[in-house]
Amino acid sequence: MRYAHVPDQQRSPLCRAILEALPAWFGIPESREAYIAEVAALAMVAAYDGAKPVGFATLRPQTPATAELHLIAVLERHHRHGIGAQLLRRIEALAQQQGARFLTVKTLAPSNPDPGYAATRAFYERQGFLPVEVFPLLWGPENPCLLMIKAL
């Protein structure tokens, strides 16, 4: 597996290809399109199997001390192979280079029983993220948001 920073003009098309292949996580068209638009302006690291992208992560600066893991997505057939963890390590290093001391991530709260997001939360916890707060209405009552944080 090869990991590389993604040039500006390649970010949105790469994001679209991965997210459209993950409808269990990114099946709400409006949300998916918002992510695709947002990544164009964010730092992105991708994982490649040969020339084919199989996952990516994006970083959004928040405050001088905090950055957000804006998005991380790996094709489902490549789950549980350490790709997400490697993408996260590279995003963490980039956040530290930018002066961040903490990394945050938002995900679906446990009050929504979606099994895919239960696995996502377990991944974040294994990577050292801790739950901070639930925002029950940020994404709508059916999609409560959990904010998690990790010290870098």
Region locations from a protein language model:
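Short hydrophobic/aromatic beta-strand or adjacent loop that forms the aromatic wall/cage
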Residues: L42, N143-L147
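Short glycine/proline-centered loop/turn elements that form peptide/ligand docking sites
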Residues: Y117-T120, V134-P144
